Amino acid sequence: MNTNKVAIFGKKGSIAKYDLTDNKPIWVGELPKGQMPHVIAQYENYILVFSWAWFGSKMVHCFREDSGDSLWSHYQQTLHSSMIPFLPHTFENHMYYLASSKEVAKLSWETGDIVFRKRFKKSIFNEYGLGIISNDVILLSKKDALIVNKETGDVKPYPELSKKLNLKEITAALGNGISFMSLISLTHPQEGDGGAGATAAGGGDGGS
């Protein structure tokens, strides 16, 4: 078993998986010119990097944790509105998340392909959160529950859940496929915010 101390660090233009014991990089992943990593997170063998450039665009990148291979990059606005946190939930190697207050999205971890980013009808007084219960992708509010078709993104009422739970009393929920990714509620802080405290580092075998 490898007992070397390993962590992933980021600086302007790149991230690196670094062996602190042997004092050498294991791999270096390049970011687009001018992009500065601000938040680094891991889900299984995937590393997500949230970056920004001075007076420029914010981006999301995905790397393979074991090799450092770059899998994909997207501009933030392609994935989600800046007005809503990026809170992905995983089912069968895909992320499901709210791309805006009235859009649900599905994204492949492996390829970065956006399977759908689809609007659904909602009242301006109704705010939804997304969760995965068993095999179902659910949108939950204080008033009702909706179920999302995982292939098309179509949304329809899910009255069965409303009958079993008093939705008005629910303030938080934990379903499947969240891991610590649900904690990334502030994926693109302002440029003046602190940096080091926003970095997630793996230990030993790289956090896996």
Label the predicted regions.
Residues 1-208:
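Secretory-pathway ectodomains
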